[in-house]
Structure formats: C-alpha cells, structure tokens
Amino acid sequence: MNVPLRSLVAAWSIAVIVTTPVAASPLEDGYVAYRAMDFGKAAEIWQSLAETGDPTAQYLLGNLYADGKGVARDDAAAFKWFRLAADQGNAAAQYNVAASYAAGVGVPKGEVEAATWFRRAAEQGMPVAQLNLGLLHASGTGVAKDSVEALKWFEIAFRGLPAGGPRMDVARAMTDVSANMSGDEINEARRRARDWKAQPQGK
C-alpha cells in the first residue's frame, strides 16, 4: 500500500486531544487550562478525575504523558491511561492503544493487538481507525489478508472523512486494493460497507 500506517497513527494521536468533546466542569476546567497552555493545571485536574475512573479524563491524561505536557513524558504511563479509558469504550483511547501496539511505544509491539484495538475504534465509527484497519486487512498485518474487508473499511472511512488529505489517502488505498479484485468482490465490499452501522461501546 502507498499509505504508511505509522504516519496515519501519528497524525491522529496528535490532533485528537484538542478535538475531543468534553463535558461540563470539572473536566472542562482541565480543558480550558490545556488550551491556555497551563498543562500542569490540566494534568492535576485530569489526574484527579482519572483516578476516579472517568474515561475521558483518563484518555486526556494519557495524552499529556505521551506528549510530556504538565508531567514528565512517560510512554508506559500514557499507555496505562489509554488502556483504562479504552476498556470503558472510549474510541479515541482505543485508537491510541492500537497506535501504541502498532509502533511499540509504551508497550511491546504487537500486530494482533494493534488490529484488535483498531477494530474496536473502527466499529465505533472513527474514520482513521477504519482506514488503518483496512490497511491491515490489505497487507495481512495482524489479521487475515482480505481484500474485500479492506475495501469495505476504506469505503466506510471515505464517507466519514472530510475532504482533504486523509480522504485522498483513502481514495488511493481504494484504488490500490481494488486493482486486484474481481467485480463480484468489489460489489461485495460495497454491500458490506452499505450495511455497516457504528456500534458505540461505552462512555
């Protein structure tokens, strides 16, 4: 494939902290502090909430550890908080758990584990997770090689992404994988994509 998995992982992990919706205070207080670049205060607020089991705070705290903002950078701690949030169904955290396994950051590299967590985020409707899952199926990395499933996920990702770079990546991936597929296989992939519905998993 022409789209490197790791570059997509990195791009999403950087962007998602400032685009994830947050609830009313005190979680919002941490978000306001983060946007004001008072990372220490954000870390203090989210740490307190994360320890009570709040999955959004756990996810956000994981990002602070991953980036070394307000706390010392600690990839293992980042993974710990991502995993706790992911286990509660937080899709963004599930994506970052997958990214951690894919790159071997904070946890030993694991292709099967990466695929498992990309799938969980993809099933909740995260387009970049869907793209990555399609790439894994296209290459047979961590999952069975399956062009029909690959194209299915590319089709789903394409309709969920805004115009621009990532959508162009999906279009290229669709072209690449479909070049070696029969008409029946392409139609089956499109049927699966049409029938697919997101399945929210938790908080």
Where are these regions (language model features)?
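Terminal, low-structured helical/coil segments at or just beyond the last alpha-helical repeat
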Residues: G165-K203
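Bacterial N-terminal signal peptides that target proteins for export
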Residues: M1-A10
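Alpha-solenoid helical repeat scaffolds
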Residues: Y59-L60, A92-N96, V128-L135, S147, ...
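Hydrophobic face of amphipathic alpha-helices that form TPR/SEL1-like repeat modules
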Residues: P26-A33, I45-L49, L60-D67, N96-A103, ...
